[in-house]
């Protein structure tokens, strides 16, 4: 199966798994085929749950310890900005490339090969922690580019793969279970990593702590690669007709930019993420370098936001179902600019934990309401793997610009402090200049969009708690990243069930 051409996993008469000895069925007996399919399906779903835990050991380190590692390597303010900017832009381009290549190449080998490559990249981080070369920060930026490039390259193919495997009736429970496993494993690794780094700092061997942490991450990704290799793909060959569909989707995307509602939404999401990126890399700098938090305190601070985001997603889901997305977007848009200001009030560890709880609540609502909003305003019958990838590319460009600007501001902030001595009387850190600028620009973006945010007519979609909002990544500062993995039915005489990857291509999803 290729992106947007779903298999029909609910039909017991599907062909057995091609190329797999365990699915070779003698004769054409429908019962034998159904039994064979049940065996590989159960095995693959079980492997996928194990793979979630294995891969979480890597993502928990990559998404949350890169900035801390850069600070250990004595990264400059500008380099901290580039560490966020360049990998995000390259990753979005890799996602578009993956969506295109998926029309020509089988997806399972693409996923497995990229996962193995990512393992090598993380091993490179181990070597970097041990060697600590003179230009270590630049090597870190290069490895981060490859790391996030691999993550984004895998994403479209993984979604399509899972969309063809997980049966409709089990989809909500399966992804809810997978998300819980990912969350628990990630938080354990995150907290354990912070404790490990704090202990190694006390012993004067921080490099060993980072090397051990990245070695665990590499081991997790290697195990993940093996589990992905063992999983079954029921539709391994790309569909030739999808190539035409890809080009049609690009044309639809260009046409959709003439839709004022979608255009305003796209610029809003990209703009907000861009101005947030101005300060995103520097909260770690503020905690570790200015406030002298231990690595464990740094980890707990981030965990407070992440846990709050997970715990409040269901609340926001029920709230948006009842009152609509616009009111949630309004609340979150007006609260997001306040968050960096709250960071400037007190350096107390417990106070900043409370700030992160507030941040998690707001970012959870923002992520869910904007995902719902996009779902309701999207063009009909569009290939949303391509559509979402292009949307991500626009946001990545904004993040690149914002993080680069943040690095420039942070680099010039100490000089500004010297020129304007009165700033030192109420600013504990030059980084407060960055926080102040991002707060102002967040307000500007919010005030620009709010008058333009019309409540669209909601489309019928599965209830939030039953479906299939997959948390693909999480970040303490910029919020969770959500993927829709919803279910639709094609209006055909045979009533075929259509499952999609990230977003639906059919016009009207049905409640499960």
Residue ranges and their predicted role:
Residues 53, 121-122, 135-154, 351-366:
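Hydrophobic core of transmembrane alpha-helices in multi-pass small-molecule transporters
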Residues 153-166, 365-380:
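Intracellular juxtamembrane helix-capping segments at the cytosolic ends
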Residues 67-72, 100-104, 126-131, 186-208, ...:
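Transmembrane alpha-helix termini and helix-breaking/packing motifs in multi-pass membrane transporters
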Residues 27-45, 232-267, 456-504:
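Juxtamembrane intracellular "pre-TM" segments in multi-pass secondary transporters
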Residues 94-109, 197, 312-325, 410:
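Helix-to-loop junctions at the C-terminal end of transmembrane segments
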Residues 90-92, 176-194, 392-407:
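Glycine-rich segments within core transmembrane alpha-helices of 12-TM secondary carriers
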Residues 109-125, 218, 327-342, 439:
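Structural signature of the two symmetry-related core transmembrane helices
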Residues 24-93, 98, 118, 123-124, ...:
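Helix-loop boundary and gating motifs at the non-cytosolic
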């Amino acid at each position: 199966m290729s992106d947007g051409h779903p298999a029909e996993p609910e039909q017991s008469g599907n062909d057995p798994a091609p190329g797999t000895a365990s699915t070779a069925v003698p004769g054409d007996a429908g019962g034998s085929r159904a039994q064979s399919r049940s065996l590989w399906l159960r095995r693959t779903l079980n492997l996928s749950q194990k793979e979630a835990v294995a891969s979480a050991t890597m993502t928990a380190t990559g998404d949350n310890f890169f900035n801390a590692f850069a600070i250990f390597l004595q990264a400059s303010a500008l380099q901290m900005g580039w560490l966020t900017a360049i990998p995000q832009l390259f990753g979005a381009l890799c996602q578009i490339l993956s969506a295109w290549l998926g029309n020509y190449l089988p997806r399972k080998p693409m996923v497995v090969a990229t996962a193995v490559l990512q393992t090598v990249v993380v091993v490179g981080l181990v070597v970097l922690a041990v060697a600590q070369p003179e230009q270590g920060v630049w090597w870190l930026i290069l490895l981060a580019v490859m790391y996030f490039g691999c993550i984004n390259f895998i994403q479209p193919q993984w979604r399509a793969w899972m969309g063809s495997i997980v049966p409709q009736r089990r989809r909500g429970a399966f992804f809810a279970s997978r998300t819980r496993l990912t969350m628990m494993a990630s938080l354990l690794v995150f907290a354990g990593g912070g404790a490990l780094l704090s202990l190694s700092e006390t012993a004067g061997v921080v490099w060993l702590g980072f090397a051990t942490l990245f070695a665990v991450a590499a081991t997790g990704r290697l195990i993940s690669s093996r589990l992905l290799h063992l999983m079954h793909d029921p539709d391994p060959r790309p569909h030739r007709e999808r190539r035409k569909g890809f080009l049609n989707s690009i044309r639809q995307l260009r046409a959709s930019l003439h839709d004022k509602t979608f255009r305003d939404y796209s610029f809003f999401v990209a703009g907000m993420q861009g101005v947030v990126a101005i300060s995103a890399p520097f909260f770690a700098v503020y905690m570790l370098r200015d406030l002298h938090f231990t690595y464990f305190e740094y980890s707990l601070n981030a965990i407070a936001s992440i846990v709050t985001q997970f715990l409040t997603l269901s609340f926001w889901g029920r709230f948006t179902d009842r009152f609509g997305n616009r009111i949630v977007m309004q609340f979150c848009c007006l609260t997001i600019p306040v968050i960096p200001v709250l960071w400037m009030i007190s350096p107390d560890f417990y106070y900043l934990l409370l700030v992160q709880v507030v941040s998690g609540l707001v970012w959870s609502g923002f992520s869910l309401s904007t995902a719902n909003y996009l779902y309701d305003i999207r063009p009909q019958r569009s290939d949303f793997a391509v559509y979402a990838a292009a949307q991500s590319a626009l946001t990545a460009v904004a993040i690149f610009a914002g993080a680069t600007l943040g690095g420039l501001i942070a680099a010039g902030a100490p000089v500004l402090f010297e020129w304007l001595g009165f700033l030192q009387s109420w600013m504990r850190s030059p980084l407060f200049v960055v926080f102040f600028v991002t707060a102002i620009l967040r307000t500007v973006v919010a005030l620009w969009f709010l008058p333009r945010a019309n409540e669209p007519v909601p489309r019928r979609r599965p209830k939030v708690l039953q479906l299939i909002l997959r948390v693909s990544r999480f970040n303490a500062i910029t919020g969770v990243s959500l993927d829709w993995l919803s279910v639709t039915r094609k209006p055909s005489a045979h009533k075929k069930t259509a499952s999609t990857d990230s977003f639906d291509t059919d016009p009207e999803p049905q409640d499960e």
